[in-house]
Amino acid sequence: MVAHKKSKKKSKKQHGSAGEKELHESKIHAEIIDDEAEYPTSRVIKRAPNGDVIVESLPEEESLDRSELNQDHRSGSSSSSTNSGGVTNTADCNADADNEEVEDTKWPIKLDTHWESLSLEERRNILRISKDELFDMIKSYKNMHNCDCSMCGRHNNLNIEQEIEQIYCELYDSAREEDSDTDFVQFHLKLIKEYQNGSNNTHHHMRHHGDKQDSNICHENFAHNDNDDNNDSTNKNAFLSSILPKEKNASTSENECTNDFLDSLSEDSAIKYCLSEGAIGLDKSYQVDFLGKEEVDSNMDTIPNSDNKTQTALDWKHEIEQFKSSKQKQVSESTTGKEALPPINDIDNTNEVIPEHDEFDSKLLHFAKTVVSSHPHIAEEFINRAMMYPHIKAITEDMMNNEGEGLKRAMESLVLQQELQDWRENMAVSIEKKIYEMDPTEPVIDVSESDSHENERVNGPANALEENNKKDVIESDSLDRPSLVDNNKVDSLIDSIPFKFVKDPKAVASLKNAFYDIFTNKTRRSEIDQDDKEYKEELERLRNEISADEDQASYEWSNDEYEESNDHDEDAEGYVDDECIDDHHLDSGYDDENEDEDIIYDDLHENVKLNEDPSAVPNGHTQLIHHDNSVTSNVSEDGIDDNYDSELDHAERLEEGRRLIQIAITKLLQKKLIASYQEKEAEKNRERLLMELEAEENQKKEKEKKKLKKKEKEKEKKRQQQLAKEEEKKRQEEEEIRLKKEAEEKEIARREAQRKKVEEAKRKNDEKRKKKLAEQRRREEEQERIRKEKEEQKRQREEEQKQKKMEKERKQREFEEQRLLKKKEAEQLQKLKENQKLNEKSMQKNQDTTTEGVPYGSVSTNPLQNNSTLNDDIFNMINEVSKSLSSSPSRNQNDLLGSSVLSNVDHQGGLNAGNVFIPPSLSMSEMSPHAQAGFNTLGSSLQPNLLNGWDQQSSTQAYYHANQPSSSEAPGLLPLSHGGSSSKFSSFADTTVDVTDDVNNLTSFLKDTTINDISLGSTSSIPAQNLDPVNMAPRPQSAVYNQPNLWNNDPNQRLSNFGQQHVQQNPISSSHSQPRRSIWDTGAENTFGVASANNFASNIWDTPTSTPALPNTLLSSQVAATSVDSYEEVLAKTYKMLSPDNSFVPLDKLYQTSLTQINAKSVLSYPQFISTLVSMKNSYNTELLNDNTGLLAYCRMGSVPVPSGLPSYNRQNTFPHATTQVQSDSQQINSVSTPISNPLPQPSSVFNDVHYNQTATTSPANHGNPIPGPTSTIASDPSNFVNFGQSYPNSYQTGNIWS
């Protein structure tokens, strides 16, 4: 509010309206002008309503006594002092008066707030009143007043205290009889409650009877007071408002009223003229108590809502004009209202006389409107009661909307229901009582009139009452003296209404009061005059203010002044809400103690102003006394008997005592409440003082802090300035340094750029120079490459020419050698033919002879054995070559034996003939072309049918590695194949021997032989059955002449040599026979004693099974110079010479020594030597021993008999692996289908007596098909064969070169 007015003040200054500023400012709270100054402890600066500044000292106590305030106000003393602006004392007095009025209106609010703030225990402490406290209060109350009324003791000789004590005891005993648990506190609370209820009843009684007395009685009662008429009217209004039910409180209950309900009231045409902002207060709980929640909700739903609360505030100008017009029409409206009474009084006679409804309703409606709207107090009370009891509002709405049809029907039904006799009795009693209590100054009603009136009642009470009312209205000159009969009639009419449609009895009483006010329109001249006076003063002041602020703040001013205009009504309305709250608490189910607390608290407000002003207390007391005992006072003044007991009976005295006790209790409670309020206010003042002191201390500290902060800020500012200077200086220095660095960096960058330019130019020059050098170097390299290519091409051409030349020479040489070989072969063939003839002859001679003791058995005769001479020559040639290879015969023997053992191991270890290796140094490819040509010529010069035993192509070329190059035999051996075919067993040649010389010697030796002496005959003419079975039997392959170290006794050397062998084969397309490895080669592919499936001959003496065998002339079985017997003798003599003690002699030594004893050395070969030793077993007891490798190494002859002798070489002692190996070999050889016969005849030689004791087996390819022919013949005589697979013990074994 203050800020809003300040803004208006500023706007006024801008417009230059300085004169309007003083009128616009109204009440403004005191405020401190200088906020920065220290808080004043003894005074405060305020601003007056006219805008002047005043200075006042702080009040020491806010709760000053009202008497002091009144004295100060009357004396005109003010606590303000003028300021420099020249403020006058008149302004101070006006401000004090305004403050005093505000304080008077704030007292009930303060007490209400204080009572609500108290706790339950504090309320109980206030309500706890003992008997002693009560009587002390009565004594002090009597001593304070020197009144001679009946309550205070009109006779001094009477002991009023004792009488009151007796009354108190009687009342307490009666209360104890009702409730035995009642104590003094509960008794006092009940008295207060009864006082509350009795005050309402007294108010109703006074409204019906007391106020209808002569006005002189009221003036006499008012003459008992010492104050002026204004105080009398104020006290009267205060007393009336204290005993009336109070529905409104300006500070508390008004906030609880709903705006919607107020807006709905403002829309009603009956009460909208009397509606004021803040004068209407409604609590919904009151309606709930009287009507129930559902009915209240239904009533509230029918109330229209109003969105604008400001519509309830009327324009003041219009209100003033309306007020004036209402005053002028008051008399006429009251007269009109009285004329409307007879129709209401005729309600009981509705069955007899029924008036016009339209006329009656219109008159009643007009009467209600005018009465309610004409007088402010009636309208205000009617509004309050309408809000408290919604049925009144409903009746009013029915009168407004339905023209009173519902009310009329209700009244008629209620009146007709009442019994006529009860109505008569009540009317008679009321009339007698009114006549008795009538003022003597009033005219006395005659007995005849009363009798007639009584008779009229019997006959037609309504008609009589209507006639009396009309008569009284006509005779009355003014509203000041209404007729007693009329009042009695109205009272009797109102009392006759039962109001059964209202549940609450209080509501019934309120309705009766409302109807009484409406029908009687009793006189309130004094109140109206007082209101007129106040309204005139307010009106004058409002006119001045409206004229001043008409254009600026009319709305604000109207609200403020409207609140001030209602201040005079707060005495009558201040506690309405409190008593309503009390009624609510009484009816809402609180406990008795809480109900009593609220009732007593409501009663305390009745005498608030009496305590505020000590001078008003006796006035109020006498007012109450005279109101309660007005009839008694009048009687005493008129000369009635002074005896108190005779005047009042015991019941009246008891009632008076009850009232006095109730008043005393109320005063006592009021005193306690005020004391509690003062204590609380004192506590608040102390707290506020402490808070102010604390605030002052805090303010001082805050100032000190501000000073310190200011100093710190200054210091900080200086420090910041100093830092800024230093920072600026530092920044300048850094700027200089930065500029220097930038200059240096620019210089460095310039130099770097210049250096880069120089380097770039140098780099470009270097690149150019390097490119030139690279180009020159590339050209030189290209020239050098071209030169080298030319030289390389030239060298290649030269090499090609040289190779061509060499090849040409080689071909020429080979051609020459082949020519020579052919020539030699032709010569040899001629010799062979000749030798064959000789051998045939020798074979025929020796065909029937057998050598006993030789295990070879007999040899069948063969007509083709005439080539023995040729065989002997060839055998001698081989012996010569063997001698030339090694000087030690034992070495050859050991090699031969090792070869046979290794062959046997090869068969046991899963090896075959194809896995045999020979040293590469001994291959035929490394032989000289001349030697190879000699061998090739020798083989090619023979006829195919005659050279089958020398050169047979194997059927399984893949098995013997046919893709490998051919190899040649060792020097000193016969060529084993034609055209470079390989041998199965390679010779272990000594690397120290010159192979070329040996081959040349062998070639020259063969030239000298008589190989061409062989006579060739037709092989087809020879029958197959004439073949020698020995020749047909297969023989194991031997490598005797393929091993140069035959007499080497070292088994490790033999094994190592055997592991280094390798076979290379080069098949010849023109030949289909397997080449022979030696003259004893029978082919490893065939089984011993079984004819080959590919028509291989078993040896050089055998022939294939498919063709007649031609006699082989390789060796002869007889030597021309020496016989077998001579060999045995030579060997025996040699043994005796070497071992006189009959010990074992090495075989090689024996063989070498025996050769020296024989003339023809070429005749005795090592195999013959072994055969001879074997044949000497029986004749000379020969014992042969094997070495660690299983070869024959030692021999012993002599008288020592052989314990077991040599094992019989039968077919049971066969080698276990021979058959398996032969079968695997036979399986591969059988693939060859072309039979090739051997044209050579079988010679008779030293090997002719050797027969293989092998059983003929079939190959896997011919399983189940045994080969016919000689196989059966061989198997038929097992005694003629030697078991070469026999394993001999280490102590004694007999073997040969194949074992």
Swiss-Prot record:
Biased composition (Low complexity): 76-90, 971-981
Presence of keyword Phosphoprotein: no
GO cellular component, one term: cytoplasm
Coiled coil: 675-847
Compositional bias of kind Basic and acidic residues: 18-32, 64-75, 467-480, 711-816, 834-843
Keywords noted in UniProt: Coiled coil, Cytoplasm, Stress response
Compositional bias annotation for Basic residues: 1-15
Superkingdom field: Eukaryota
Biased composition (Acidic residues): 547-573
Main location: cytoplasm
UniProt-annotated location(s): Cytoplasm
Biased composition (Polar residues): 325-337, 844-868, 960-969
InterPro entries in alphabetical order: MAP7_domain-containing, NST1
Ranges annotated as spanning the membrane: none
Residue numbers spanned by region Disordered: 1-104, 200-237, 324-347, 446-486, 543-573, 694-816, 834-868, 960-981
Similarity comment text for this entry: Belongs to the NST1 family.
Record PANTHER family: MICROTUBULE-ASSOCIATED PROTEIN (PTHR15073), RETICULOCYTE-BINDING PROTEIN HOMOLOG 2A (PTHR15073:SF1)
Protein role: May act as a negative regulator of salt tolerance.
Protein name according to UniProt: Stress response protein NST1
Lineage: Eukaryota, Fungi, Dikarya, Ascomycota, Saccharomycotina
Gene: NST1
